């Protein structure tokens, strides 16, 4: 019987073969969709440790979310699928809706000022720029008269 140290040299070969199997066998979407809810359940169980009013504060559960992300990536790869993919993203979006639907950020809604204010704010600098350029050109043509 081989010791773990003796089997260690087989690890790269095993990883290579597993990677090739995923590419040859293709993506088992059905299997992936059966396995992803395990990640969601584990995440839900971990989120029960966090008070609901803290669910919008990422620093309160970032470790749990990282674990959830790693789980979805691993389960997706085991089934020979790339991560992320549309089905996995749809599942993750569903988890987001379940836990973070009330986490909207109130942002200031900016509006343009009324036209009575906006037009002068645009027109005055344009007119001044044209006037100053014209003054420079006119002055450069008439410099010999001043000297």
Curated annotation (Swiss-Prot):
Residues of this chain annotated as glycosylated in UniProt: 28, 57, 70, 102
Primary residence: membrane
Q: List the disulfide bonds.
A: 39-71, 56-103
Residue ranges, Extracellular side: 23-112
- Which biological process annotations from GO are given for this protein? adenylate cyclase-activating G protein-coupled receptor signaling pathway; adrenomedullin receptor signaling pathway; amylin receptor 3 signaling pathway; calcium ion transport; cellular response to estradiol stimulus; G protein-coupled receptor signaling pathway; G protein-coupled receptor signaling pathway involved in heart process; intracellular protein transport
Q: Which residues lie on this side of the membrane: Cytoplasmic?
A: 138-147
Q: Name one GO cellular component term.
A: lysosome
| TM regions (residue ranges) | 113-137
Q: Which GO terms describe its molecular function?
A: adrenomedullin receptor activity; amylin receptor activity; coreceptor activity
Keywords of this entry: Cell membrane, Disulfide bond, Glycoprotein, Membrane, Receptor, Signal, Transmembrane, Transmembrane helix, Transport
The region annotated as signal peptide is 1-22
- Expression by tissue: Expressed predominantly in the testis, embryonic and adult brain and in kidney.
Q: Localized where?
A: Cell membrane; Membrane
What is the recorded membrane topology of this protein?
Single-pass type I membrane protein
**Where in the chain is the site Required for CALCRL interaction?**
112, 140
PANTHER family found in the cross-reference section: RECEPTOR ACTIVITY MODIFYING PROTEIN RAMP, RECEPTOR ACTIVITY-MODIFYING PROTEIN 3
* Protein family per UniProt: Belongs to the RAMP family.
Complexes and interactors:
Heterodimer of CALCRL and RAMP3; interaction induces allosteric modulation of CALCRL function and ligand specificity for adrenomedullin/ADM and intermedin/ADM2. Heterodimer of CALCR and RAMP3; interaction form the receptor complex AMYR3 for amylin/IAPP. Interacts with GPER1.
> What name does this protein carry?
Receptor activity-modifying protein 3
Tell me which species this is from: Mus musculus (Mouse)
Which gene does this sequence derive from?
Ramp3
């Amino acid at each position: 019987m081989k010791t773990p140290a003796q089997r260690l040299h087989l690890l790269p070969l095993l990883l290579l073969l597993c990677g090739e199997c995923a590419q040859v066998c293709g993506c088992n979407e059905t299997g992936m969709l059966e396995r992803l809810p395990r990640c969601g359940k584990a995440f839900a169980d971990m989120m029960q440790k966090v008070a609901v009013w803290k669910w919008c504060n990422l620093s309160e559960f970032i470790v749990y979310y990282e674990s959830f992300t790693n789980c979805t990536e691993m389960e997706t790869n085991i089934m020979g699928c790339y991560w992320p993919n549309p089905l996995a993203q749809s599942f993750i979006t569903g988890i987001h809706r379940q836990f973070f639907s009330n986490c909207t950020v109130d942002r200031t809604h900016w509006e343009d000022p009324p036209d009575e204010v906006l037009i002068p704010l645009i027109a005055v600098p344009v007119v001044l720029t044209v006037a100053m350029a014209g003054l420079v050109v006119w002055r450069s043509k008439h410099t010999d008269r001043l000297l």
